[in-house]
Amino acid sequence: MASPSKGNDLFSPDEEGPAVVAGPGPGPGGAEGAAEERRVKVSSLPFSVEALMSDKKPPKEASPLPAESASAGATLRPLLLSGHGAREAHSPGPLVKPFETASVKSENSEDGAAWMQEPGRYSPPPRHMSPTTCTLRKHKTNRKPRTPFTTSQLLALERKFRQKQYLSIAERAEFSSSLNLTETQVKIWFQNRRAKAKRLQEAELEKLKMAAKPMLPSSFSLPFPISSPLQAASIYGASYPFHRPVLPIPPVGLYATPVGYGMYHLS
């Protein structure tokens, strides 16, 4: 029969996994060995109460995989380094271009900073909000000054203009002497007054045209007068020797619709 000390020597608490006990078959010794095996199993479990309380960590077996991966990484590292060096040796251009672009960008940024610091150099001239001055027509330097007519002279000139718009040489000389004016002053005043009268007359005619303008559009017209259709037809038909008898045309009226003008018969 196997003794407990022998069982303890065969199984260690640090081993993981189920352990096989070499002992006799079923019997009292076999039962004790099974109980010892269960006790060893319980004590060897990493999540058992004893293991958690004692804070013992089971030894981890060194797996061969990390060693293999480390050796593979060690062998690949020189290959990568050699490939990187060859790529650098074959293509030196791309390495130089970033530095060139960086230098160009820095120069551009410096130019932009200088442009921002010196606004008066590149900025357009400021706009002045002063009101624009109206440029008056320049008169001739040798122009004669305007004649300051008095009120009595203006009334006499207006009265004479209403009587007669054109004065003869004798009338102008007599009239100018009566007003203490020169003949040239009287002649120029009458010329200006006639031009003013013409402008007033044209304005009055334009007002009359606007007042007499029909409400119908100018493109709309009837081929015959609405007031006397029979009379107009008889006049036009009498001048032609072989005219057809004119049929009586009923009087028509106009009415306005949202779309346009229509005609309807008057009853």
Curated annotation (Swiss-Prot):
DNA-binding region: 142-201
The protein's role, per its UniProt record: Acts as a transcriptional regulator in bone development. Represses the ALPL promoter activity and antagonizes the stimulatory effect of DLX5 on ALPL expression during osteoblast differentiation. Probable morphogenetic role. May play a role in limb-pattern formation. In osteoblasts, suppresses transcription driven by the osteocalcin FGF response element (OCFRE). Binds to the homeodomain-response element of the ALPL promoter.
Keyword check for Cytoplasm: no
Originating organism: Homo sapiens
Disease cited in the entry: Parietal foramina 1: Autosomal dominant disease characterized by oval defects of the parietal bones caused by deficient ossification around the parietal notch, which is normally obliterated during the fifth fetal month. Parietal foramina with cleidocranial dysplasia: Combines skull defects in the form of enlarged parietal foramina and deficient ossification of the clavicles.
Localization: Nucleus
Keyword Signal: no
SMART domains: HOX (SM00389)
Protein name: Homeobox protein MSX-2
GO molecular function, one term: transcription cis-regulatory region binding
Composition-biased stretches (Basic residues): 136-146
A GO BP entry: embryonic hindlimb morphogenesis
GO CC entries: chromatin; cytosol; nuclear speck; nucleus; transcription regulator complex
Subunit record text: Interacts with MINT. Interacts with XRCC6 (Ku70) and XRCC5 (Ku80).
Chain spans, region Disordered: 1-71, 116-147
